[in-house]
């Protein structure tokens, strides 16, 4: 039987917390920042918790986490 592979694109985008929730960072926060206002850039800095409806699919993509 083969080993279950981790989906590398998902592994780079999500981290798992101790409680089992998944944390990710929002996109559009790395460049072309001059036209984005201060409030938007500040909110892009924070990490966000993934909605629980997507947890089952992400657990399938990340079996080792």
Swiss-Prot record:
Q: Identify the InterPro entries for this entry.
A: Ribosomal_bL35, Ribosomal_bL35-like, Ribosomal_bL35_CS, Ribosomal_bL35_sf
Q: Which GO terms describe its biological process?
A: translation
Query: According to the UniProt entry, where is the signal peptide?
Result: none
| Keywords per UniProt | Ribonucleoprotein, Ribosomal protein
Chain segments carrying region Disordered: 1-65
One cellular component term from this protein's GO annotations in UniProt: large ribosomal subunit
Ranges annotated as biased composition (Basic and acidic residues): 54-65
GO MF, any single term = structural constituent of ribosome
Sorted alphabetically, which PANTHER family does this protein's record hold? 54S RIBOSOMAL PROTEIN BL35M, LARGE RIBOSOMAL SUBUNIT PROTEIN BL35M
What family does this belong to?
Belongs to the bacterial ribosomal protein bL35 family.
- Quote the protein name from its UniProt record: Large ribosomal subunit protein bL35
Please name the source species: Desulfosudis oleivorans (strain DSM 6200 / JCM 39069 / Hxd3)
This protein's gene is called rpmI
């Amino acid at each position: 039987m083969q080993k279950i592979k981790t989906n590398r694109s998902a592994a780079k985008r999500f981290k798992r917390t101790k409680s089992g929730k998944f944390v990710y960072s929002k996109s559009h926060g790395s460049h072309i920042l001059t036209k984005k206002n201060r409030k938007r850039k500040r909110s892009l800095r924070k990490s966000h918790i993934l909605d629980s409806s997507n947890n089952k699919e992400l657990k399938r993509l990340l079996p080792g986490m």
